[in-house]
């Protein structure tokens, strides 16, 4: 069915209040967008990331009388009569089909493919990870996930143990197992991530070699040949003492979720215990790798 979209611009501080106003006026869903496409930095746990200038977009049923909606919104103290807004009729589409059509198998490095379940596998002889795009966790489309997958593809993982610190969907741990790792361990603070990783591991036939833990449950003496952490610069710095002890002597470390402008401070947090490689950049993001001294 067709929809009507109403967009208004405000400050990040007022976005939540105007979101409530749109819902009270009849919106069936709300979306926040950055007006200026500013890079996203770390939110605090549980925080909704908003920007200095934020577009608040309400979606309304096509039968909605938008004059009535505008009249209701004009009564809000943050808006007032004649407030700036844009109303747009959205054409009727098969939105689910259009969303699915945007996702294709993606190749990382020489061997590894990430494939949505509804697409044909491009190369049956390649290392294929079946993973459907989702809203919350990594699927390979973000530059940081791509950087980590390419790094794993270039390693000899046969018989190795790999820790995926901040596992999300489990994409990195599962890729490592498909690339030959004997065992992978996924750690995440979010129980939903643990469940997503478990489901994806079962889909890819590697659940018997994947251990998953919330931080409070992880074994104390846990070690691995390879440790990868695709989280964010702030946590990477703060958790450096914890992450640094996970690789065995001579083990490998891969870090991402870091903007290029943040790379130096993250490198500084690990330089004492690791011999670091040159930083690799992709679309303003970077990957930091090294070997345990």
From Swiss-Prot:
SUPFAM superfamilies: S-adenosyl-L-methionine-dependent methyltransferases. The keyword S-adenosyl-L-methionine applies. CDD domains: AdoMet_MTases. Its main location: cytoplasm. It comes from the Bacteria. One of its GO terms (cellular component) is cytosol. S-adenosyl-L-methionine binds at residues 145, 166, 188, 230. It catalyses: L-lysyl-[protein] + 3 S-adenosyl-L-methionine = N(6),N(6),N(6)-trimethyl-L-lysyl-[protein] + 3 S-adenosyl-L-homocysteine + 3 H(+). Signal peptide: none annotated. GO terms for biological process: methylation. Its EC number is 2.1.1.-. Keywords: Cytoplasm, Methyltransferase, S-adenosyl-L-methionine, Transferase. GO terms for molecular function: protein-lysine N-methyltransferase activity. Pfam families: PrmA. It is an enzyme of class 2 (transferase). It is found in: Cytoplasm. HAMAP family: Methyltr_PrmA. Belongs to the methyltransferase superfamily. PrmA family. PANTHER family: ELECTRON TRANSFER FLAVOPROTEIN BETA SUBUNIT LYSINE METHYLTRANSFERASE. This is Ribosomal protein L11 methyltransferase. The lineage of its organism: Bacteria, Pseudomonadati, Pseudomonadota, Gammaproteobacteria, Enterobacterales. The gene is prmA.
């Amino acid at each position: 069915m067709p929809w009507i979209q109403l967009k208004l611009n405000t400050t990040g501080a007022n976005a939540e209040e105007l979101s409530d106003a749109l819902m009270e006026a009849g919106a069936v869903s709300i979306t926040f967008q950055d007006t200026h496409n500013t890079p996203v930095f770390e939110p605090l746990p549980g925080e909704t990331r908003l920007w200095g200038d934020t577009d608040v977009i309400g979606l309304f049923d096509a039968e909605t009388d938008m004059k009535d909606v505008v009249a209701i919104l004009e009564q809000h103290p943050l808006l007032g009569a004649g407030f700036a807004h844009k109303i747009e009729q959205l054409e009727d589409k098969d939105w689910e089909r259009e969303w699915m059509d945007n996702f294709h198998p993606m190749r990382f490095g020489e061997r590894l493919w990430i494939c949505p379940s509804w697409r044909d596998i491009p190369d049956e002889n390649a290392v294929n990870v079946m993973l459907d795009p989702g809203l919350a966790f990594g699927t390979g489309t973000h530059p940081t996930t791509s950087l980590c997958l390419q790094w794993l593809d270039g390693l000899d993982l046969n018989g190795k143990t790999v820790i995926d610190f901040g596992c999300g969907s489990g994409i990195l741990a599962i890729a490592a197992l498909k690339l030959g790792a004997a065992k992978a361990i996924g750690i995440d603070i979010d129980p939903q991530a643990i469940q997503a990783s478990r489901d994806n591991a079962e889909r890819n036939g590697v659940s018997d070699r994947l251990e998953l833990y919330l931080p409070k449950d992880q074994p104390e003496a846990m070690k691995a040949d390879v440790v990868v952490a695709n989280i964010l610069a702030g946590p990477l710095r703060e958790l450096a003492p914890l992450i640094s002890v996970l690789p065995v002597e001579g083990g490998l470390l891969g870090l991402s979720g870091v903007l290029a402008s943040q790379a130096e401070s993250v490198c500084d947090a690990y330089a004492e215990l690791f011999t670091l490689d040159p930083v690799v950049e992709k679309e303003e993001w970077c990957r930091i790798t090294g070997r345990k001294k």
